A protein has these predicted regions:
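Feature primarily recognizes SF3-like P-loop helicase cores of small DNA viruses
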Residues: 2-194
């Protein structure tokens, strides 16, 4: 989460949270949005990542929050890699001249299902931290105000923990997460529609 507070893309990392509903993905999404503030996130969905007008909304944003993808949706690998890496891209606002931007927003992708990808190379998976949300909270045990409480009451502590974790990730070279993602490459490749 601390990487999402940085105004650079030098680590080339995005986050994909995966799991069936009722497990906290939307709480985390709300906390991330609360952490960066309403004016500092975009919400360009996967099917619009090739749209130059939509991509322009990511200019100077810390986070691009993708809230769901269809089970049969394809991961737009080239666009995802370019955004996560902060590559130069020409975008435009309506009725304005095109301009070049280097996005630095962290892609936060919350999904019930892993999207299919045409690119099963290391390049895409080296860029995505894939976090499993395996525990479904029974409806009677859910705190429907949890996200609101965390954002309103716990944000200073959350930001401190996020920045401390980011500093540790930088020191370790993000090594642990990279090993975790190797296992996901195998899982995703086995599910690939070849």
């Amino acid at each position: 989460m601390g990487y999402s507070l940085q105004t650079h893309a030098r680590h080339e990392k995005g986050i994909m949270t995966v799991g069936v509903g009722g497990n906290g993905k939307s709480v985390l999404d709300s906390v991330v949005k609360g952490m960066v503030g309403h004016d500092n996130f975009a919400a360009v969905q996967p099917n619009n990542l090739d749209n130059n007008f939509q991509k322009a909304t990511m200019r100077l944003k810390l986070v691009n929050a993708i809230t769901e993808s269809e089970q049969s949706s394809k991961l737009p690998s080239g666009h995802v890699k370019a955004i996560i890496s902060g590559e130069a891209m020409t975008v435009e606002n309506k009725r304005k001249d095109p301009f070049v931007m280097h996005p630095f927003c962290t892609l936060w992708w919350a999904t019930n299902h892993l999207p299919h990808a045409n690119d099963y190379s290391e390049a895409i998976y080296r860029r995505m931290f894939i976090v499993e949300f395996n525990n479904t909270v029974p409806p009677e045990k859910r705190d429907t105000k949890l996200a609101e409480k965390l954002v309103e009451q716990e944000m200073p502590g959350i930001i401190k923990m996020a920045l401390d974790a980011y500093a540790e990730a930088v020191r370790s070279g993000f090594a642990i997460a990279d090993l975790h993602n190797i296992a996901w490459v195998i899982v995703i490749a086995k599910k690939a529609p070849f």
